[in-house]
């Protein structure tokens, strides 16, 4: 009986990878404009059937650590992403916590009623 139970459990666990579906099979993830998704250190969460991806938007001018701010992308299926631009751009105000040239590490978004 114990051997049968072990066999059934192992067989069931071997079926799990076939049930899981990857949102994408690799390659470059692009948004609705055809550009590479620029959301470094971000997180994805689901709210009312829409996935939201917030992350640091980094400069594309050859300066790998120059932050532009926090960008937002949305998707219904984790495959097709819509770019909503910068939702929190860096500030031109000297001394600001998000002053131009800063690095924004792992931005988070909290729901506020």
Regions found by a protein language model. Give the residues of each.
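Bacterial N-terminal signal peptides
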Residues: 6-15
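Carbohydrate-active catalytic/glycan-binding domains of CAZyme proteins
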Residues: 19-113
